[in-house]
Amino acid sequence: MELIFLGTSAGVPTRTRNVTAILLNLQHPTQAGLWLFDCGEGTQHQMLNTAFNPGKLDRIFISHLHGDHLFGLPGLLCSRSMAGNAQPLTIYGPKGIREFTETALRLSGSWTDYPLEIVEITAGEILNDGLRKVTAFALEHPLECYGYRIEEHDKPGALDASALKAAGVKPGPLFQDLKAGKTVTLNDGRVINGADFLAPATPGKSVAIFGDTAPCASAITLAKGVDVMVHEATLDTSMEEKANSRGHSSTRQAAQLAHNAEVGQLIITHVSSRYDDRGCQRLLAECQAIFPATALAHDFAVFTV
């Protein structure tokens, strides 16, 4: 998987950072997919500066209905129709996402010429496509807000064809069942368990993408043990009380959560527009003092999971 940050600013854009939007390129050899997490104003314009086509998006996950995470959605939906050949799209988000989307399209005389499904979610598993699952966790913010945990299923180990041949099992249709870990009966009556001839499974990758939040009880479960955690760091540690009062987190709190949840890497984003480049580096240093494996996202930054 690959994360591409299209916008990393909190609340309003700056000259160098747009508001929140993150692409997740699934990069699966047999079932590719392009997912978008949040869609702040100008997201479709940001995508023009990447190699990715909005028409290829197949799922959009909205964390909450604040404008800096949402106002780019109607325009993106319409542009997909104007460009043509857009594939079916499913939007996930909190209660109100359907009314917002349908009202924006209706009042502007707009429409979509591709299948569009809107799913209003609650906390819990919201998607399992056989290759990965997505679980939504309620966060602490003035509006109903969610974070998303994306987990690939473990990849089955390779079938040891040499060992099977040594056991007298010839290559053929049975190999598919054995590769799936099934038990098969040979013509001579022998019973072969495919699991005995498989290499260990490769653990799937996992990502936790937080919406806006103050520290909350669900955060540790959302992030526990993931390879990459994407979390807001709206304000520095000295402004922690102000951040929390508005449903946001400080650098220290993001880093401490990453440490407690034992994640592989922390990527901080959603940085207040009050910070220039030097200020952003100070935010990064505050996080790294607690959790060294921290990176600071900037617009168009790409991270491999």
Curated annotation (Swiss-Prot):
Give the required cofactors.
Zn(2+)
Q: How is the cofactor bound?
A: Binds 2 Zn(2+) ions.
Q: Name one Pfam family in it.
A: Lactamase_B_2
Positions binding Zn(2+) 2 in this chain are 68-69, 212, 270
Task: Name the Enzyme Commission number(s) assigned to this protein.
Answer: 3.1.-.-
A GO term for molecular function: exonuclease activity
Residues that, per the record, bind Zn(2+) 1: 64, 66, 141, 212
Q: Quick one: signal sequence residues?
A: none
The keyword Plastid is annotated on this UniProt entry: no
Catalytic residue list:
68 (proton acceptor)
Which keywords does this chain's UniProt record carry? Endonuclease, Exonuclease, Hydrolase, Metal-binding, Nuclease, tRNA processing, Zinc
Function (record text):
Zinc phosphodiesterase, which has both exoribonuclease and endoribonuclease activities.
NCBIfam families recorded: PRK00055.1-1, PRK00055.1-3, RNase_Z, true_RNase_BN
> What quaternary arrangement does the UniProt entry report?
Homodimer.
Family in the record = Belongs to the RNase Z family. RNase BN subfamily.
What name does this protein carry? Ribonuclease BN
